[in-house]
């Protein structure tokens, strides 16, 4: 049976914390920031913990990564 590949898009959007929670980050901070206020850019830098109901689906996408 072939190896299960990691969903590379998942590894860029989501990470698993040391306690096993799934953390995501807000979009819209990478480029074209000149028109945005500093508060908006700083607010997008913070990650947030996803709801528990989403964890199993997200971890399945990261399965091949060994997390």
From Swiss-Prot:
Keyword Heme tagged: no
GO molecular function, one term: structural constituent of ribosome
Annotated keywords: Ribonucleoprotein, Ribosomal protein
One Pfam family recorded for the sequence: Ribosomal_L35p
Gene Ontology CC terms, in alphabetical order: ribonucleoprotein complex; ribosome
A biological process from GO: translation
Cited NCBIfam families: rpmI_bact (TIGR00001)
Family label: Belongs to the bacterial ribosomal protein bL35 family.
HAMAP family noted in UniProt: Ribosomal_bL35 (MF_00514)
Name the record gives this protein: Large ribosomal subunit protein bL35
Organism: Deinococcus geothermalis (strain DSM 11300 / CIP 105573 / AG-3a)
